[in-house]
Amino acid sequence: METQRASLSLGRWSLWLLLLGLALPSASAQALSYREAVLRAVDQLNEKSSEANLYRLLELDPPPKEDDENPNIPKPVSFRVKETVCPRTSQQSPEQCDFKENGLLKECVGTVTLDQVGSNFDITCAVPQSVGGLRSLGRKILRAWKKYGPIIVPIIRIG
């Protein structure tokens, strides 16, 4: 009788350990990677967008150096998305779409949570201020210098 109780008790402990072992991997599987969380945020941005085409992740800044591994705490993110050739109404994944030549580029910043079940994000995307204006101004100055520099330099030396 005593052996039967010990055997039953051992069986219960084995069952508890087995259940605990099965529960642990599923708990850790609920945390998304930093990149996966951003890709989910991009999907949500595409769903809420009123623009014609889907956007796809172009570049992701490295994750912040944090000691906190809690997937429920928002993590700061910074990334860039670019317009693709796929219409927003298509059911295609943005990752399968080619980037549109001269497609619109957007810089996005905000926070994401890595929790797979209740993943939240607060992302703002904007078209970056054009540095092309500065480039074209620089080119104009360079062209003017090449054209008028040989005339101006002797005048400056005389004066």
UniProtKB/Swiss-Prot annotation:
Its BP terms in the Gene Ontology are: antimicrobial humoral immune response mediated by antimicrobial peptide; defense response to Gram-negative bacterium; defense response to Gram-positive bacterium; innate immune response
Which stretches of the sequence are propeptide? Answer: 30-131
The keyword Secreted is assigned to this record: yes
Tell me yes or no: is Disulfide bond among this UniProt entry's keywords.
yes
Report disulfide bridges, numbered on this chain: 86-97, 108-125
What GO cellular component term, any one, is given? Answer: extracellular space
Modified residue Pyrrolidone carboxylic acid is at which positions? 30
Give any GO molecular function from the UniProt entry. Answer: lipopolysaccharide binding
Q: Which domain of life is it from?
A: Eukaryota
Localization annotation: Secreted
SUPFAM superfamilies this protein is in? Cystatin/monellin (SSF54403)
Name the PANTHER family for this protein.
CATHELICIDIN, CATHELICIDIN ANTIMICROBIAL PEPTIDE
The molecule here is called Cathelicidin-5
